[in-house]
From Swiss-Prot:
Keywords: Cell wall, Hydroxylation, Secreted. This is 230 kDa cell wall protein. Disulfide bonds: none annotated. It comes from Phaseolus vulgaris. The modification 4-hydroxyproline is found at P6, P8, P9, P10, P11. It comes from the Eukaryota. One of its GO terms (cellular component) is extracellular region. It is found in: Secreted, Cell wall.
Amino acid sequence: NMYLPPVPPPPVVPTF
């Protein structure tokens, strides 16, 4: 398995 660095979470879109 290749090393995968931590991925930042996707941007959260606020729902109104």
